């Protein structure tokens, strides 16, 4: 009887040890497939409408960053800085990540991307400018446009901004708030906005003196920005996989539904 119990005990022990080894191996493989967390990483947010507000420490990109960091298992230091500074640090490799970035030929040389939403750009223009399309704004040489420094848009809007830049008809700012102020003062007559900015327009007096005009561009993909100087192509692919998992399981859609109607949230995140 004692011998029988011992044999059974040894059998169960072998099964238990085998299962533990398999679980350990699976955990090791999962860790190997995830991003490398051997050093502290850095991510910068920028203030921009519903994407992020430093005043309340809330926004779409804050929610996205929290979930991304949690899934990665890495230690990531999150800061807030101007968009122009973010691009400089991404290019130099002094910053690993930022969010809601769009690509360009120049940026593709130093940054990788993992797309998680797509949206259109619009021209917010003063009613007294009597403008109904980009062409009529451009044709009136007295009209000035305000843009956030280092921002790029869709192809048609980029060409529009570049032509006005050549004519010295651009006023730059670090963020939206200064542009709203000088638009109200008629120092500029138009500015480029996104759906993230609608709530700010609707909640202030500027709504009564402006009109939103379609730029004619299609939706532009936005995503996680990754520095090619600080992250290898292999590591970028791992972060891209994390972002894709957040899209696939509906996490990105649920984040956007906190800030937009279900219809608009789906239009921006399912593409």
Protein language model regions, located:
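Flexible hinge/capping segments at coil-to-helix
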Residues: 125-145, 160-161
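Ligand-binding cleft/hinge of the Venus flytrap
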Residues: 65-72, 115-116, 141, 151-173, ...
């Amino acid at each position: 009887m004692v011998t029988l119990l011992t044999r059974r005990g040894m059998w169960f022990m072998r099964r238990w040890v085998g299962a533990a080894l398999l679980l350990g191996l699976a955990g090791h493989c999962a860790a190997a497939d995830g991003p490398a967390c051997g050093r502290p990483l850095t991510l910068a947010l920028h203030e921009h409408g519903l994407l992020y507000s430093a005043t309340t420490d809330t926004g779409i990109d804050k929610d996205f960053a929290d979930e991304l960091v949690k899934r990665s298992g890495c230690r990531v230091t999150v800061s807030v800085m101007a968009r122009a500074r973010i691009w400089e640090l991404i290019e130099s490799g002094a910053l690993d990540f930022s969010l809601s970035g769009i690509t360009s030929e120049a940026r593709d040389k130093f940054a990788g991307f993992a797309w998680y939403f797509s949206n259109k750009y619009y021209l917010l223009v003063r009613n007294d400018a009597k403008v109904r399309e980009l062409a009529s704004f451009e044709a009136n040489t007295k009209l000035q446009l305000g843009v956030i420094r280092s921002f790029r848009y869709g192809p048609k809007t980029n060409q529009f901004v570049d032509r006005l830049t050549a004519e010295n008809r651009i006023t730059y700012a670090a963020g939206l708030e200064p542009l709203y102020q000088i638009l109200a003062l008629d120092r500029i007559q138009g500015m480029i906005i996104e759906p993230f900015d609608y709530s700010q327009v609707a909640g202030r007096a500027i709504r009564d003196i402006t009109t939103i005009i379609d730029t004619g561009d299609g939706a532009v993909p936005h995503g996680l920005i990754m520095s090619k100087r600080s992250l290898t192509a292999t590591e970028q692919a791992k972060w891209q996989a994390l972002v894709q998992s957040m899209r696939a399981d509906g996490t990105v859609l649920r984040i956007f539904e906190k800030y937009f109607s279900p219809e608009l949230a789906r239009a921006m995140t399912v593409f």
